[in-house]
C-alpha cells in the first residue's frame, strides 16, 4: 500500500517549525503563496514559542 504525502499546507507548517527550531528568521520564509506562507509562519511562531518555553535548545 502506498503512503500518502501530507498536504502542502501541513508540510509548510512543519517546515516552518523546523526552520524556527533551527534559528532562521521569519524573513527567510521560502513560500510566495499566501496560504503556504501563513502556515509556514504559524509553524515558525510555534517553534519560537516552544524554544522560549525551554522545550528545545
From Swiss-Prot:
Belongs to the ribosome modulation factor family. Gene3D superfamilies: ribosome modulation factor like domain (1.10.10.620). InterPro entries: Ribosome_modulation_factor (IPR007040), RMF_sf (IPR023200). Residues 1-24 are annotated as: Disordered. The keyword Cytoplasm applies. It comes from the Bacteria. Its main location: cytoplasm. During stationary phase, converts 70S ribosomes to an inactive dimeric form (100S ribosomes). One of its GO terms (cellular component) is cytoplasm. It comes from Colwellia psychrerythraea (strain 34H / ATCC BAA-681) (Vibrio psychroerythus). Keywords: Cytoplasm, Translation regulation. It is found in: Cytoplasm. GO terms for biological process: regulation of translation. Pfam families: RMF. This is Ribosome modulation factor 2. The keyword Transmembrane helix does not apply.
Amino acid at each position: 500500500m502506498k503512503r500518502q504525502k501530507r498536504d502542502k499546507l501541513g508540510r509548510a507548517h512543519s517546515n516552518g517549525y523546523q526552520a524556527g527550531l533551527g534559528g532562521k528568521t521569519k524573513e527567510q520564509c521560502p513560500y510566495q503563496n499566501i496560504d503556504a506562507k501563513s502556515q509556514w509562519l504559524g509553524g515558525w511562531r510555534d517553534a519560537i514559542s516552544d524554544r522560549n518555553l525551554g522545550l528545545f535548545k
